[in-house]
Amino acid sequence: LGLEPWGKAAPESTQERALHALHPSRLRWTLLLLAVLLVSGIGATGFTHLMTLYMSEGMDAMRTAAAFSLCGLALMAGKCVCGALCDKLGSYRANYLLFGSFILGCTLCVLAPLKSEALMLASAVFLGFGGSLITVGVSIWAGDLSTPERYEKTLRLFQGAYGLGGIVLSFLPGAIADLAGGYA
């Protein structure tokens, strides 16, 4: 698990040395917080529009609700697996894997006009599983992008940006649907 015995000084890792030497500019921190804000816009509100998308395409409401429930189950499973993946593969590779799953789910949502139940279920699973990183990844990113001394401050900044993004960007899917004439 990466735990160290109490009282034994562990040698500083390469990552910690690099982070101690690195003093990101305000521009880099601003861009990083903007990225967290945008990610939260997807993670905090994006899932709620999955049902609306498929129902607006004429899919059965009960089957769409089942797909949404499946998305929730995949999200819970992904949250349980996310930490283990980060420990086993490293957070860098786990980010690629989980975001790849999320992007695949989004890509399958684009195929909603085909009215395929299999594609709807697959999109729900990939969105849910990949979306786990969007919801629990903030603390992982804060740990990777800060030193132990700065972790709490970095996490607080990231969580603030995440919360702000969820509030500020929550209207976007509906506004885009209004402008585009529908969700699909």
Language-model features: locations:
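Extracytoplasmic gate region of multi-pass secondary transporters
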Residues: 25-84, 169
